[in-house]
Amino acid sequence: MAQVVMSALPAEDEESSESRMVVTFLMSALESMCKELAKSKAEVACIAVYETDVFVVGTERGRAFVNTRKDFQKDFVKYCVEEEEKAAEMHKMKSTTQANRMSVDAVEIETLRKTVEDYFCFCYGKALGKSTVVPVPYEKMLRDQSAVVVQGLPEGVAFKHPEHYDLATLKWILENKAGISFIIKRPFLEPKKHLGGRVLAAEAERSMLSPSGSCGPIKVKTEPTEDSGISLEMAAVTVKEESEDPDYYQYNIQGPSETDGVDEKLPLSKALQGSHHSSEGNEGTEVEVPAEDSTQHVPSETSEDPEVEVTIEDDDYSPPTKRLKSTEPPPPPPVPEPANAGKRKVREFNFEKWNARITDLRKQVEELFERKYAQAIKAKGPVTIPYPLFQSHVEDLYVEGLPEGIPFRRPSTYGIPRLERILLAKERIRFVIKKHELLNSTREDLQLDKPASGVKEEWYARITKLRKMVDQLFCKKFAEALGSTEAKAVPYQKFEAHPNDLYVEGLPENIPFRSPSWYGIPRLEKIIQVGNRIKFVIKRPELLTHSTTEVTQPRTNTPVKEDWNVRITKLRKQVEEIFNLKFAQALGLTEAVKVPYPVFESNPEFLYVEGLPEGIPFRSPTWFGIPRLERIVRGSNKIKFVVKKPELVVSYLPPGMASKINTKALQSPKRPRSPGSNSKVPEIEVTVEGPNNSSPQTSAVRTPTQTNGSNVPFKPRGREFSFEAWNAKITDLKQKVENLFNEKCGEALGLKQAVKVPFALFESFPEDFYVEGLPEGVPFRRPSTFGIPRLEKILRNKAKIKFIIKKPEMFETAIKESTSSKSPPRKINSSPNVNTTASGVEDLNIIQVTIPDDDNERLSKVEKARQLREQVNDLFSRKFGEAIGMGFPVKVPYRKITINPGCVVVDGMPPGVSFKAPSYLEISSMRRILDSAEFIKFTVIRPFPGLVINNQLVDQNESEGPVIQESAEASQLEVPVTEEIKETDGSSQIKQEPDPTW
């Protein structure tokens, strides 16, 4: 801030306070300009005097010079005082005629206009994320009023240039300036596009409305989708980080996150950069968020990180880089302090508006590029751009005039900030084509770049080509090291197994040598750029000729490169053994006993664990990452199980172990372990009366959950977990979704009241009964089978949900049958035989399962659907096992295949049927898959973490068998708790939370 020195100037009255603020504001702007001049190595010193204040601004050296020469300041102040006195005397001598009064009013109104204009410039600069003054484009704002919204103007005052305001309006604006703010919705449209952009303008106007409320915190997860038409299933995504490359090519489109507002703030130009209150970064940089605290990164380039849950607090979207972060009035100094930047991270987010906005921006940039490219090749009208050619021949084909730090790529790979900056610089953009013959030489590249192809296809084509180029480069350099002129295949595994005797020099910094299939696009590009200096060093050529077994698993030869999946599997097994042994000691047993984790979680008062490392709760080892597992192993001596009520766990023990427990601790008499007389074995009753039955007994069934039941306070992933709160929340959400479905079903029938949905009918006849408007990736089924994220997504999307009933008569018949089946009261058979049996086990909770005869046909259809899912799952498991070289079916990691596109390709699927888990497939699709079973084939393009491919015979390395099986199991344990598993018993569906330990 400028230095202020108090002088002895005569004080003015309080009317000058407004002008004082304007002067302070302008001096701050002057100081920002001096900082920019200092970056150009120009030195500036400035002394300003206003009333009783002396301002000293300038560069660091300039201020130091002025502060040492106090005589300069005194002389300047003295001169200003004398001139002020002369002006006052002359003012007294002049007569106050009407003309003079009018001139005074003109000066005043001009001053106020200047003040308002400067404040508008300050607000506009603040909306752009800058601390400097930015000129307001009044003409563009008035022409395209939906691009920039001005809030806080006094009621009845429209936004326009200050020169069009009268004196009273100007004063009124200055009095209410504390609430004035600019919000930039999108870049300005060109005039010709603005005339036809009614839809976009209407959308932008809707986005101006502030939300009437905000929804509660939403835990979501993300899966990659395609191009700009993306419909992210969740709001955030977990991906790897390549911090060394600022222009990492990301085929996966992320919704704005908390880091977007910080990392994507780039200046419009260096001249207006100023001092930013947040660090500038690159929008392409991806952030890795581990599921456990301080979990290390997977060493491979293609690693998949554990999924994370992101909480989004609000439901309205405003551009991250343009939104006014604080609704509080600005402080008296108009320039915001950098210290406040950290407090302005709360933003409202609405994916639909964000998606519409980024789609429109990408379309504009795509049209701009095509128009500029057509001008370069002298073609008429827009022309499709061969992006791969521009990326492969950067010296002969390139683009000039792009904003600094933005590489030329397909617009679908840019985020909103870069798209806006490109549009602002559209006049300077120019395509340079030095070799026109390149545009017609490579037809393969043009075929790979079809306009209809999505981001995934483009990414796959690009990375495949780059890997091929790098592999050819390595083969050539490897042959040179061996004294050969012909390229030779590189034994990558041997280089990894013997890093001291076989290695490569000249690779870019922080890039290890390995097979090109492990590199991402940024590293591949860097390797190609330094291809001339790459050199293979072979100290022991004999290693290349011997086929040793030690290279069959190169990633596990050294501790540094040990496979992550094998390592975490071993640690989990070790911790599991520790827990089992400690649990047995607590029961007074000598042999290890498997811990019933759900029982501990459900009874934390009577069953808990002491001595765990600080911050680590007690739960199944499959929930822990490597850091926590290692901490538990190191502190295993302190761990102690406390069992206050052994009767809670006795039913979970093996039959031979129960009799060895000290019976004094039991509160109830010991009973035989036979199934018919053991009171400790609870039996569950389920009464199935119809497809929509929801009996009290069903709701009372306790299912094992993966929640925390330890008495040790902890905060998993930053929040303290409460099973009661979670259970209450999911129960409430399920009820809301069920009520919503019932209301929509009634609307489809033309009724005002809600109608209970016959889910079995919808599942059995999907062509005649179906639901439209559900969020992408969410199938229609009972609300009880959904987790919290999907329930919340359904409620957010409730306005679009619509039930389609093509055969109302069949629907009414099903409703009547369901009603008639529920009308008679349930009768419990009281035959003498039953009474005799019940008398022997009076304390058992035995309940009959009653199935009305009318529902048998419907239940058989549901059973057929479940059988189809099992058959499809078995088919996929068998095909996947064949693809990875196994002779037996292997559980398919559906989620990992989905979030690692390009790693595993599934061919032979029926037309119109995409590959996904069987639980998400329609009945008709599953039948078509089974009909095409012989054509379906899994192909592993490149491995991903958790996938172990056995290319050797099983008997060559028998020790790999258990590891592979465990890793296959471990790869499935990464699925979050919120994944729905639908269990169908008759027509009633009971959601079971996955329990990897039982």
From Swiss-Prot:
Free-text tissue specificity from the UniProt record: Ubiquitous.
Location relative to the cell: Cytoplasm; Nucleus
Taxonomic source organism: Mus musculus (Mouse)
Residues with PTM Phosphothreonine: 556, 558
Main subcellular location: cytoplasm
Biased amino acid composition, Polar residues: 690-711
Entry comment on modification after translation: Transiently phosphorylated on tyrosine residues by BTK in response to B-cell receptor stimulation. Phosphorylation on Tyr-248 and Tyr-398, and perhaps, on Tyr-503 contributes to BTK-mediated transcriptional activation. Sumoylated.
Protein name, per record: General transcription factor II-I
Function, as annotated: Interacts with the basal transcription machinery by coordinating the formation of a multiprotein complex at the C-FOS promoter, and linking specific signal responsive activator complexes. Promotes the formation of stable high-order complexes of SRF and PHOX1 and interacts cooperatively with PHOX1 to promote serum-inducible transcription of a reporter gene deriven by the C-FOS serum response element (SRE). Acts as a coregulator for USF1 by binding independently two promoter elements, a pyrimidine-rich initiator (Inr) and an upstream E-box.
GO cellular component: cell projection; cytoplasm; neuronal cell body; nucleoplasm; nucleus
One BP annotation, GO: transcription by RNA polymerase II
Disordered: region residues: 241-341, 661-714, 816-836, 960-998
One GO MF term attached to the UniProt entry: DNA-binding transcription activator activity, RNA polymerase II-specific
Residue spans of the GTF2I-like repeats: 103-197, 352-446, 457-551, 562-656, 724-818, 859-953
Start-end of Acidic residues biased regions: 302-317
